[in-house]
Amino acid sequence: MKKLEVFGAAKLKGQIRISGSKNASLPILAATLLSNKKISLANLPRVKDIETMILLLKSLGSIIEDNKKELIIKNTKQTKTFAAYSLVKTMRAGILVLGPLLAKFGKAKVSLPGGCAIGTRPVDIHLQALSKLGVKYKIIQGYVHANAPKGLIGANIKFPKVSVGATENLIIAACLAKGKTTLSNCAIEPEIKDLVNFLINMGCNIKWTAKRTVRIEGVNNLKELDYSVMPDRIEAGTYLIAAALTEGNLKITGIDPKIISTEINILKKVGSKITLKKNEILIQGSKKIKNINIKTSPYPGFPTDLQAQMMVLLCKANKRSHIKEEIFENRFMHVAELNRMGAKISINGNQASIEGNIKFEAAELMATDLRASVSLILAALAAKGKSVINRIYHLDRGYEDIEKKLKKVGAKIKRIN
């Protein structure tokens, strides 16, 4: 099994270009199932979850050509509606093929999803909303068996709580439904806006009518499309935190600062000096890190996908900080490993109390999920000596060329068997 060796105490300095967004690419790839026309996608990150989604599309009959610069997808012979557990088990985004399969064929058998073990992530919201479009479903032996005998029919749907995945699935499904669908209490993450932009460019009729309300009118014909996926704001936030943690000096390029304004404002509050330019962020980490209290929440709030990384930074703050996790109920599994490195973090329900002024100690560590794995890399970068991180297959699900990018800005990091 592969591991990472990280030698700490280096100040990161240089430039990092941000890759395409994993969380935008996955629903866009699923949405290509709606069309029989050629679709070309550029700026896809080369990470494991994307590879898995490509394999899933191929298993459904998509013909896919990869020339490394772009992915060319044709669904002219795509007739299969069965998404197997063997492909869906490693990523929760597998459930996103349910909506387009039902929209196109009126039936689907899709395995319940896997991914990081950071909460139950129920698909009930997806299924209850799809039922309002005319879908009948049963869950049998870990599979969703769904069909729409009369096809999908537009409806007014209010999500009981904000859900990124359910918003994506329903927007995609409604694009081919009969009549109009109005979805309210939608998630409004930039990745969802990117999905909607992709769908509109493909010929779908979608309009935001309020901050969290979207109206979709079903269409019969879609167009060929060349599309470039947005940059990854979570990757950008991770490297900004790495700079703040190591007193580094980084230029982050290829991303609009507006989409991570919440994260930028928090980093300014803890002491980092940040300069914003068009598609560039310059950050200078401070020797003195100020404490702060944070809670995760749906966009435009602080993202749960940066909670673990931010926790590492707050271990170096001048006083105690608190983080309240309000998205997932089991997202503090990195705490035990950070405490083994000298952190003093205590958990009470969904709140973490983080003592400041910590000096991290190098250690052998075990990653538990995607974002936890990168938080351990950050802690190792701030520690003296050599740390070894096990189970880095989690990392490969979501970060493109992370060792290469970190090496380029001065980190001592290498992959070993």
From Swiss-Prot:
Residues with PTM 2-(S-cysteinyl)pyruvic acid O-phosphothioketal: 116
One cellular component term from this protein's GO annotations in UniProt: cytoplasm
Keyword Cell division: yes
This protein's pathway: Cell wall biogenesis; peptidoglycan biosynthesis
One example of a Gene Ontology biological process annotation: cell division
Catalytic activity: phosphoenolpyruvate + UDP-N-acetyl-alpha-D-glucosamine = UDP-N-acetyl-3-O-(1-carboxyvinyl)-alpha-D-glucosamine + phosphate
GO MF term set: UDP-N-acetylglucosamine 1-carboxyvinyltransferase activity
Alphabetic keyword roster: Cell cycle, Cell division, Cell shape, Cell wall biogenesis/degradation, Cytoplasm, Peptidoglycan synthesis, Pyruvate, Transferase
Subcellular locations according to the entry: Cytoplasm
Span of the signal peptide: none
Principal place of residence: cytoplasm
EC number: 2.5.1.7
Domain of life: Bacteria
Binding site for phosphoenolpyruvate: 22-23
Active site residues according to the UniProt entry: 116 (proton donor)
Keyword Nucleus included in the entry's annotation: no
Gene3D superfamilies for this protein: Enolpyruvate transferase domain
Residues annotated as binding UDP-N-acetyl-alpha-D-glucosamine: 92, 161-164, 305, 327
Family: Belongs to the EPSP synthase family. MurA subfamily.
PANTHER family found in the cross-reference section: UDP-N-ACETYLGLUCOSAMINE 1-CARBOXYVINYLTRANSFERASE
Chain's role: Cell wall formation. Adds enolpyruvyl to UDP-N-acetylglucosamine.
Name of this protein: UDP-N-acetylglucosamine 1-carboxyvinyltransferase
Species of provenance: Pelagibacter ubique (strain HTCC1062)
Gene label: murA
